[in-house]
Regions:
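Alpha-helical transmembrane segments and their immediate juxtamembrane cytosolic regions
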Residues: 2-439
Length: 439
């Protein structure tokens, strides 16, 4: 830990003056909300009859659908991603770097840490299948790998970034309008004409529109800092719009999935999710000066850098930590920790202990696997763009399959085609972890 803190302290000290620390701050805030939100939402209960119930805390929290407006922070990742990609694409726009090389480098950085996650869970499924009930193995593997939906979408948007950014440079905010128009058309087909399957296209249209707004944010920052007043107006307008389209029933209220609550704006995303993202951008702009002062302090900035350096590992492994702890807790001391009925006072009083355990387990996993965020292949990118395209399709497609179908069947049998596709895509892109250097 001391070595890591010393390393990140050097990174913090070497931060260029041109870096927008506000973007990093909100990315860290978002990952913490995601992690603790997932942990608090999870409820495991061994009922008096011995049956195991896997529940969601939002099922009994009052006005839980409205609460999701506070905890749904995925738009921040796409806003920050668009901002960062706009800055990183400068070399491509100037002709100093080929699109193929840029895409390959980004795919490696994003997918290399995913490879050990998939391999570990294939191994765990094979081992646990011999002595753990199949339904528990399936639920644990599914819970641990469902965050890969984000990687599936983000890998796709990043692979398209050289083209969508060039589109932005030509047409500017019109690109957001085009994507929003497409998303509205999909929502109409889904909710008015009863074609739910069409809604899945909005993973690209809605999140693509948010990503384009990230380009917009970056271009505004290059000219002048956006004022707090603009942020307040954007927040107020977006909030009013969000209330209007949900209160009138045009869109669901919930921004995350709530069991038994029906349709949500999350899976697949709707235009309401874009409006939530605009509201969050309003908050970012309105508080920008205060956050700049906070991040200018060395200790504050060092903390942000320390988390940012392992942010992908935290995201990928925080639910594995929960699954592994839960699997052990179900058998330790006759499952005493999980015999408390969820939603009761006793259950809420044990949440700090639950979170403490999960922070500890996640810390161990991060210490083991964070190295794969840095052990990125240095070999040249594929010579042909077709190879890169196939690699992107295989990696993004396998991530989507893992998060929706599962890496294992309900009988806890590994679906070998999925990890095979992931490894094949990683091999094509050079996204397999680089061997440890002994020099």
């Amino acid at each position: 830990m001391k070595k890591y803190l010393a390393y990140t302290r050097k990174l913090a000290d070497a931060t260029p003056e041109t870096r927008n620390r506000v973007v990093d701050f909100w990315r860290v805030v978002a990952i913490l909300v995601v992690v603790f939100g997932h942990w608090l939402a999870a409820s495991i209960w061994i009922k008096p009859d011995g049956n195991i119930a896997l529940l969601n805390s939002l099922e009994w929290i009052p006005y839980s659908a409205w609460v999701t407006w506070l905890v749904q922070v995925m738009p921040i990742f796409f806003l920050a991603g668009g901002y960062a990609n706009a800055r990183a694409l400068a070399k491509v726009e100037n002709g100093d770097e080929q699109r193929r090389d840029w895409i390959t480098a980004r795919m490696r950085r994003l997918f290399t840490p995913v490879v050990p996650l998939l391999l570990v869970w294939v191994g765990l499924i094979l081992i646990m299948h011999t002595f753990v009930p199949a339904e528990i193995v399936y639920a644990g593997a599914m819970a641990a790998t469902v965050p890969l939906w984000f990687l599936a979408v983000y890998l796709t948007l990043t692979a398209l970034a050289p083209f969508t950014f060039a589109w932005w440079r030509r047409l500017g905010p019109v690109t957001v309008v085009w994507l929003l128009g497409a998303a509205v058309a999909v929502d109409v087909a889904r909710f008015v004409f009863g074609l739910p399957g069409v809604g899945w296209v909005n993973f690209l249209f809605v999140w693509g529109a948010v990503h384009q707004v990230g380009y917009w944010w970056s271009s505004l920052d290059l000219r002048h800092a956006v004022g707090a007043r603009t942020g307040r107006w954007l927040f107020a307008g977006s909030l009013a719009t969000l209330i209007a389209i949900t209160w009138t029933g045009l869109y669901p209220v919930a921004m995350v999935g709530i069991p038994g609550a029906g349709a949500t704006n999350m899976t697949p995303p709707t235009v309401a999710m874009f409006v939530l993202g605009a509201m969050q951008l309003g908050i970012i702009w309105a508080t920008q000066r205060a956050i700049e002062r906070f991040t200018s302090k060395l200790h504050s900035w060092h903390g942000i850098v320390a988390i940012s350096a392992v942010i992908m590992t935290i995201y990928l492994w925080h639910l594995s930590a929960m699954s592994l702890f839960a699997a052990g807790g179900l058998f330790a001391f006759d499952g005493a920790f999980f015999r408390i009925e969820p939603g009761t006072l006793a259950w809420w009083l044990t949440r700090p202990l639950w979170l403490t355990f999960l922070v500890a387990v996640t810390g161990v996993l991060v210490s083991l696997f964070a190295v794969f965020e840095w052990r990125i292949s240095r070999r040249p990118a594929p010579n042909k763009i077709q190879v890169v395209v196939v690699g992107v399709l295989l990696t993004a497609g396998s991530a989507a399959a893992v998060s929706t179908i599962g890496i294992a069947t309900r009988d806890a049998v590994v679906q070998w085609s999925i990890p095979a596709a992931a490894l094949a895509g990683a091999a094509l892109l050079g996204a397999l972890p680089r061997p440890r250097s002994h020099t």
